[in-house]
Amino acid sequence: MEVRTVEGGFIGKGLRMGVVVARFNDLLTGELLKGALDCFERHGVEEVDVVKVPGSFEIPLVAKKMAESGRYDAVLALGAVVRGETKHFDLVANEVAKGVANVSLDTGVPVIFGVITVEDELQGFNRAGVKSNKGFEYAMAALEMADLMRKMEE
């Protein structure tokens, strides 16, 4: 029996990346963006376009526009949703997750869900720079998926 395993790598040379980032909760999203850009630079990505949107809820529409453009090998969606006293947190978090997944499925372009959902700002800071930077990790997923899709087309 012959088994062929296909995996994506982390070499960014020749890849074009799109990033859509929410301005709301910018103390957190700004750090996620820094982490993502650091990752892309360290892995040789030469072309990155960053588009800023008002909040996380607006991410799927812009991610779709970017994915449909044919310009990007992957799109990274960055945002931060912090729980408040109302159900707004659950509604936004769920709809953004569904929207991002649908964009990826509808376009065939990897769209990475890089929206942190946290109970409070301290938890957010722990995910966006103090203990680790999820932006870097999400960018790694974008690299891997872009390379995987390229390999699957060979």
Swiss-Prot record:
**SUPFAM superfamilies reported for this sequence:** Lumazine synthase (SSF52121)
Q: Where does (2S)-2-hydroxy-3-oxobutyl phosphate bind?
A: E85, T86, R127
The alphabetized UniProt keywords are: Riboflavin biosynthesis, Transferase
Q: Which GO terms describe its cellular component?
A: riboflavin synthase complex
Instruction: State which pathway it belongs to.
Output: Cofactor biosynthesis; riboflavin biosynthesis; riboflavin from 2-hydroxy-3-oxobutyl phosphate and 5-amino-6-(D-ribitylamino)uracil: step 1/2
UniProt-listed CDD domains: Lumazine_synthase-I
Which major enzyme category is it? Answer: transferase
Say which domain of life the source belongs to: Archaea
Record field: catalytic activity: (2S)-2-hydroxy-3-oxobutyl phosphate + 5-amino-6-(D-ribitylamino)uracil = 6,7-dimethyl-8-(1-D-ribityl)lumazine + phosphate + 2 H2O + H(+)
- InterPro entries given for it? LS, LS/RS, LS/RS_sf
Q: Where are the transmembrane segments?
A: none
Annotated NCBIfam families: lumazine-synth
Q: What does this protein do?
A: Catalyzes the formation of 6,7-dimethyl-8-ribityllumazine by condensation of 5-amino-6-(D-ribitylamino)uracil with 3,4-dihydroxy-2-butanone 4-phosphate. This is the penultimate step in the biosynthesis of riboflavin.
Instruction: Give the similarity note.
Output: Belongs to the DMRL synthase family.
Q: What is this protein called?
A: 6,7-dimethyl-8-ribityllumazine synthase
Origin species, per record, is Thermococcus gammatolerans (strain DSM 15229 / JCM 11827 / EJ3)
Tell me the name of the encoding gene.
ribH
